[in-house]
Amino acid sequence: MPTDLIRYGSISPEMLAYLWLLIEYKNSIMVAGEVATGKTTLLNAFSLFIPPQMKIVSIEDTPEIRLYHENWIAGTTRSGFGGEEYEITMMDLLKAALRQRPDYLIVGEVRGEEAKILFQAITTGHLALSTIHAKSPEAVIRRLNAEPMNIPKIMLEQLNAICMQVRLIYKGRFVRRTKSITEIVEYDPKIDDIILHDVFRWNPEDDTFEFSGESYLLRRIAEFIGISEKEIINELHSRAEFLRNLCKTKPNFEEFVKKICEYKEYHKGD
């Protein structure tokens, strides 16, 4: 649950409010990190911001994603015990998923040639949420651009944001933190590289999360819905305060989704 992550100190209400806005306005997000850093946990948590009526297709090797949406279709790979013709790969599932025309596509982990199909889907307007094994946002770009994925850098700018997960010892105990949320701004042909911008960063000195105050994606959302940058930042803080207060009630899934829907209904037309 998103509220659990806030209570554990893994992420701030502002960061989750930011991800809520990104998901609501169809931005693709990748969660990166090493083993046991909480990548799937965060992916699962912010997937709960997907409106309940939307069609979701998830694809995984091992079933870890847990959603409660009525229109959720879960796909899992299968080894070909009776030969290769009986094998179901990530590529097979991804191709089948796109034929179902989902509103949201969730891929448990991207690591092979299926990334090409995923980015083709993003380029044609599908929203994708996924995880990847990498140590930094820059490493995400390098891995996606290299074998066996081979995603052209100019296509990588279709991905909107990268959440960086870490597991470390802080004040004598193991903790998980969302170390940063980084926006993919654009591909710069002059340097043949992707321009990145950190919107949020974890400060290990006092275990707080810092907002840079500037977001290209929030600016784009503001332009899309016809409001000012100041208004979209105010909306970010409004949603953060809502999530902060929601933590106090320790809601279950049904209560959480109901409150999210009530918030959106109450603020409709603001």
From Swiss-Prot:
Top-level taxonomic group: Archaea
Pfam families: T2SSE (PF00437)
GO MF terms held by the record: ATP hydrolysis activity
Disulfide bonding pattern of the chain: none
Annotated InterPro entries: P-loop_NTPase, T2SS/T4SS_dom, T4SS_GSP_E_ATPase
Family from the record: Belongs to the GSP E family.
Descriptive protein name: Uncharacterized protein MJ1287
